[in-house]
Every structure is written in structure tokens, then in C-alpha cells.
């Protein structure tokens, strides 16, 4: 059996957010949310909805040291919120995104050092997730259409194309 989720950010937009969540849950779907810092978490808990995923950080990025420190620090905050919501998955985007979904600090060329930093950051997040009983998911955002400058997107796609399938 499988379950489907609907992103509360994208549907019933004329309604207050908590009502969107109630409607989605009432239709039998799990709920995805994005910027939890702008939400009344206790009101979301009271909806009784099942949350499938949420954004797993507030600021920061995977590929530079300063951004990585910030990403891990805010991921710890996200884990605490996920626990309150019973949300098992937290999304990452490789970099902080603004309100339009664009990178706060666009990166158009990723160096080897940046990949190593991203690897170390993901390793730290994996440890955090394991301790907290949640899974961090790296979302491969579309750079060609609506998320240019996300540092991990292009390479992740090329890795997939280059894999040998047996």
C-alpha cells in the first residue's frame, strides 16, 4: 500500500494555512509543508493531519563551510519541529532559497572542495537524522526552469545519467 501527499503551500491558497491542512487531510492525503518558521506549529498539530515531509532547515547551504554550519544548526531546529508534527522526512535543497524559490546565494560552478564540503555536511545530517529517527531528503531542484544556481542539482542529474544499469 502507498500513501500520497499534497503540498499545503500550493493548494487551497485562498484559505488560511491550517484550513488547507485540514482539507488535505480530510481528502485522505498526507500533508507537505515548506517554511515551518512562519506557521503556528501547535495549530498544525491540532489538525490531526499526517505530515509526510517539511523543509529540514531554515538557512545555510551544503557546499560552503559557513553555510554548512548554519544548515546543520537550523536542521537541529527543524528536527525538533518535525518531532512535534510526527513528520518523518525533512527536505534539503543544497542552498538556502528565497520566497521565490531562488537560491539566496546562487552557485553556477561547483568545485571539488565544495563537493567534499557537501559530502561532510550530508554525513553530519545523516547522523542527526539517525539519532532523531527522521530522514533528510536532498531534493534535486530544476535549475533549467525555476531554480537556477542550486549547487547540487546539475551534478546529481549527471550522476544519474552516467550510472550503468544492470
Predicted regions span which residues?
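N-terminal pre-domain/capping segments
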Residues: 1-88, 112-113, 119, 163
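Active-site acidic/histidine proton-transfer and metal-coordination neighborhood
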Residues: 65-166
Amino acid at each position: 500500500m502507498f500513501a500520497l501527499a499534497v503540498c499545503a503551500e500550493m493548494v487551497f491558497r485562498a484559505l488560511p494555512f491550517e484550513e488547507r491542512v485540514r482539507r488535505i487531510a480530510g481528502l485522505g492525503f498526507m500533508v507537505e509543508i515548506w517554511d515551518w518558521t512562519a506557521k503556528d506549529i501547535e495549530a498544525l498539530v491540532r489538525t490531526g493531519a499526517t505530515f509526510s515531509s517539511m523543509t529540514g532547515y531554515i538557512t545555510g547551504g551544503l557546499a560552503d563551510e559557513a553555510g554548512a554550519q548554519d544548515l546543520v544548526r537550523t536542521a537541529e531546529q527543524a528536527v525538533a519541529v518535525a518531532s512535534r508534527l510526527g513528520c518523518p522526512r525533512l527536505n534539503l535543497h543544497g542552498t538556502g532559497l528565497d520566497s521565490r524559490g531562488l537560491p539566496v546565494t546562487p552557485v553556477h560552478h561547483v568545485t571539488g572542495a565544495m563537493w567534499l564540503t557537501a559530502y561532510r555536511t550530508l554525513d553530519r545530517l545523516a547522523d542527526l537524522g539517525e539519532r532523531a529517527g527522521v530522514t533528510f531528503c536532498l531534493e534535486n531542484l530544476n535549475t533549467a526552469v525555476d531554480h537556477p544556481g542550486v549547487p547540487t542539482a546539475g551534478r546529481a542529474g549527471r550522476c544519474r545519467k552516467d550510472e550503468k544499469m544492470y
